[in-house]
Swiss-Prot record:
GO terms for cellular component: plasma membrane; plasma membrane light-harvesting complex. The gene is pucBD. The core complex is formed by different alpha and beta chains, binding bacteriochlorophyll molecules, and arranged most probably in tetrameric structures disposed around the reaction center. The non-pigmented gamma chains may constitute additional components. The chain crosses the membrane at residues 24-46. It comes from Rhodopseudomonas palustris (strain ATCC BAA-98 / CGA009). InterPro entries: Antenna_a/b, Antenna_beta_CS, Antenna_beta_dom_sf, LHB-1/5, Light-harvesting_complex. Keywords: Antenna complex, Bacteriochlorophyll, Cell inner membrane, Cell membrane, Chlorophyll, Chromophore, Light-harvesting polypeptide, Magnesium, Membrane, Metal-binding, Transmembrane, Transmembrane helix. This is Light-harvesting protein B-800-850 beta chain D.
Length: 51
């Protein structure tokens, strides 16, 4: 892995592979946050003790 200049230490991924993986992680995080916001809003609306 050290001999290959296209691979990035310590993952062994190329720059393009790491950018693609990063894009998927960020997209997944955005989806998770959107679901969490909806869930918190619904919990607030339907929980009488929060009002």
């Amino acid at each position: 892995m050290v001999d290959d200049p296209n691979k990035v230490w310590p993952t062994g991924l190329t720059i393009a592979e790491s950018e693609e993986l990063h894009k998927h992680v960020i997209d997944g995080s955005r989806i998770f946050v959107a679901i969490a916001i909806v869930a918190h809003f619904l919990a607030y609306v339907y929980s009488p003790w929060l009002h």
